[in-house]
């Protein structure tokens, strides 16, 4: 028992140290290995001791010490088998330590009068914890990483913590995360994501880079690489000639390059992040039995891994912003600063983020990027929370990549399609004008006569989208509104936005996109933003907003019978020109109908009995008209909203918006009074009253009101700007 006492006291010393010390430095991890190894030695020695007791007739468990030492071993073995994962892991480690302490105390009580030397030795061994703390302090800064050359990432703003390159082998180990038994589900999800195919394994991106390098300074590609090719950039593989066929060129955005980000330098985007070398356990780059030992060490003591790989910044919108907010400047375009795609600011200044007081619509609680694009998935992966993990499919709208021969994945296509069709956007046949008479909102059936010119209004509203629609590269993405009329035989007799024989969209269609021009006035059609100098138009829709599209149709003579008017909001990831330019063997990319509406044309009068629910349709139309500065139509619409649903405070708020634009401040104030009566302490009321006070020159009152809004919406940029002015 004395020998067992010394051995378990030794284990207790290292165990206590491992329990109370923050897991940093290589010494700590080697001590874990020592603790586990000596634990198995103790298991063998203890088993032999119990066997001897059993043979002598004493029984296996004959004392308190035997019970406690058995529990110590049992909890230790369970911890080794299951890992220190989650609440169960922490409970096992705690019980393992408590039972060991109990054994020591019970033994000291038993031997205190008979063996003073034992106590002195015990105290000495406990003091060993202090020595271990000192050694850990000395070696805390020691690392098993290799110091590389200083970085040159320009024009990318990426930085590393050390200012040196990082070995590619340290940040290109996604497969290890998935095959070590820790994160197989997350790894499988990542394999079916655009992050996996962000680099030169993406033919659309590779073709874009090929064109860039043939028409601009070759170092410009580093500006792209901070987000598309982090392994190559961070390891210095973009110095000199780039090997597009290397393993690293096919790596995409790996686990380590995303989770290795320690901070976001500011909110300018373009990959303006700081990345650190991942924490290294012993034998991180080994194979065979040493690799198994490495995996065991991470499982038994994952705190260092967890603390380094999951930081608070990783759950913030700013984390996604760093690569989903883009600008170009002279180093990229030899021209001037231009704003590229920008999902972050659109989200930040919207009701979705909870920041914008004046938003038309907002969810019941604020949402971040991760809520929509990293929804919870059922998983038993290590580190799961109640059986769920954040999804690493990064659900979005890219159905092009999983349609390619080398990456064909019907499951991915279906998942993206389901995501796009999940209440992201709405299409509504709102109204029709016949011979100067306007009828709205339309019900399921309308009356039209031959030889009549009609104007049909279609409202498109963003609903479940936290940024502008479309997001991403608006020059190559292809969402459009397809409107067509079918007769009783299903034949199309009128159409806008239909496809021709080569799958090009009718160019008279209404597209939700941006048309970018180069210095010659030519369209940017090769994903060549470095040649972009100006934007012809941008038809994107802000989050929680709406657009109205007008169609005219001359109904010919002799047309009678029943018809259907159908409107589809279609989305194709890349327009046909991009597909034909970039793919050696062009394919037909999927076209997803995100939303649709249908109205039947019959020969009896429309039912004009409106329901309260129709108020939202009218409101959406008013929003679209207000965005087009058609104030008369907007005012009429919002007035109807207040008449149809007088309890809807936003109806009066929106009416006040129109009156303020018209300079009718008395009417606006009156509308705000109604809104305040319906919804007391409504921040929108204070904001628009502040606008009125400012326009009337009552600056003290305006300041008071804008400050009032700041208390509930401190991040609202528009309110802050109004206050500053």
Predicted regions and their residues:
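Structural signature of tandem alpha-helical TPR/SEL1-like repeats
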Residues: 628-640, 661-674, 681-686, 693-708, ...
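Amphipathic alpha-helical repeat scaffolds of TPR domains
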Residues: 611-624, 650
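Primarily the internal scaffold of c-type cytochrome electron-transfer domains
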Residues: 121-125, 138-168, 186-220, 237-543, ...
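Membrane-embedded alpha-helical bundles that constitute the cytochrome b-like, heme-associated redox core
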Residues: 1-147
């Amino acid at each position: 028992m004395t020998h067992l006492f010394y051995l378990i006291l030794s284990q207790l010393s290292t165990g206590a140290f491992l329990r109370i010390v923050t897991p940093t430095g290589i010494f700590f991890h080697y001590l874990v290995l020592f603790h586990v190894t000596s634990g198995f030695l103790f298991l063998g020695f203890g088993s032999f001791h119990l066997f001897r007791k059993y043979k002598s007739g004493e029984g296996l468990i004959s004392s308190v010490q035997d019970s406690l030492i058995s529990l110590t071993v049992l909890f230790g073995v369970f911890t080794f088998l299951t890992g220190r994962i989650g609440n169960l892991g922490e409970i096992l480690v705690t019980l393992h330590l408590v039972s060991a302490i109990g054994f020591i105390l019970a033994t000291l009580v038993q031997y205190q009068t008979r063996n003073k030397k034992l106590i002195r030795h015990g105290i000495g061994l406990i003091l060993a914890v202090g020595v271990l703390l000192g050694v850990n302090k000395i070696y805390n800064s020691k690392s098993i990483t290799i110091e590389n050359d200083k970085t040159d990432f320009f024009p990318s703003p990426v930085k590393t913590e050390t200012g040196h390159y990082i070995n590619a082998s340290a940040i290109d180990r996604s497969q290890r995360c998935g095959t070590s038994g820790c994160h197989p589900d997350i790894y499988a999800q990542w394999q079916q994501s655009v992050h996996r195919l962000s680099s030169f394994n993406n033919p659309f991106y590779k073709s874009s880079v090929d064109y860039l390098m043939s028409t601009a300074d070759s170092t410009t590609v580093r500006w792209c690489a901070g987000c598309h090719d982090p392994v190559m950039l961070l390891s210095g593989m973009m110095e000199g000639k780039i090997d597009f066929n290397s393993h690293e060129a096919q790596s995409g955005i790996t686990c380590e390059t995303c989770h290795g980000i320690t901070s976001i330098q500011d909110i300018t985007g373009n990959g303006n992040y700081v990345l650190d070398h991942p924490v290294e356990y012993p034998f991180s780059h080994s194979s065979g039995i040493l690799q198994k030992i490495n995996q065991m060490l991470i499982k038994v003591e994952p705190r260092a891994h967890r603390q380094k790989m999951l930081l608070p910044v990783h759950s913030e919108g700013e984390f996604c912003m760093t690569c989903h907010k883009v600008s170009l400047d002279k180093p990229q375009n030899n021209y001037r600063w231009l704003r590229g795609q920008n999902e972050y600011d659109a989200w930040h200044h919207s009701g979705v983020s909870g920041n914008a007081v004046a938003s038309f619509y907002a969810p019941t609680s604020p949402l971040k990027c991760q809520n929509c694009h990293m929804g919870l998935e059922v998983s038993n992966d290590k580190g799961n929370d109640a059986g769920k993990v954040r999804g690493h499919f990064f659900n979005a709208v890219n159905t092009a990549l999983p349609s390619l021969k080398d990456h064909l994945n019907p499951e991915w296509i279906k998942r993206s399609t389901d995501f796009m069709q999940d209440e992201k956007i709405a299409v509504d046949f709102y109204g029709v004008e016949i011979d100067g008479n306007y009828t709205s909102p339309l019900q399921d059936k309308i009356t039209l006569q031959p030889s009549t010119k009609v104007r049909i209004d279609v409202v498109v509203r963003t609903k479940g989208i936290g940024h502008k629609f479309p997001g991403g590269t608006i020059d190559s993405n292809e969402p459009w509104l397809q409107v067509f009329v079918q007769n009783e035989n299903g034949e199309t007799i009128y159409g806008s936005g239909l496809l021709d024989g080569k799958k090009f969209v009718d160019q008279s269609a209404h597209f939700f996109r941006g048309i970018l021009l180069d210095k010659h006035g030519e369209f940017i059609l090769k994903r060549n933003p470095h040649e972009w100098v100006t934007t012809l138009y941008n038809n994107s829709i802000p989050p929680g907003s709406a657009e109205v599209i007008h169609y005219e149709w001359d109904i010919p003579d002799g047309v009678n019978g029943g018809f259907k008017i159908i409107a589809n909001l279609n989305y194709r990831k890349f327009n046909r020109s991009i597909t034909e330019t970039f793919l050696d063997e062009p394919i037909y990319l999927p076209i997803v109908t995100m939303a649709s509406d249908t109205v039947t044309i019959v020969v009896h009068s429309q039912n004009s009995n409106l329901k309260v629910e129709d108020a939202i349709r009218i409101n959406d139309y008013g929003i679209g008209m207000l965005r087009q500065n058609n104030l008369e139509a907007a005012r009429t619409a919002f007035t109807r909203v207040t008449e149809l649903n007088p309890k809807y405070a936003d109806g009066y708020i929106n009416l006040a918006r129109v009156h303020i634009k018209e300079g009718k401040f008395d009417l606006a104030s009156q509308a705000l009074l109604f809104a305040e009566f319906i919804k007391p302490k409504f921040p929108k009321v204070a904001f628009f009253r502040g606008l009125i006070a400012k326009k009337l020159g009552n600056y003290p009152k305006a300041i008071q009101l804008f400050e009032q809004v700041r208390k509930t919406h401190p991040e609202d940029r528009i309110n802050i700007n109004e206050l500053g002015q």
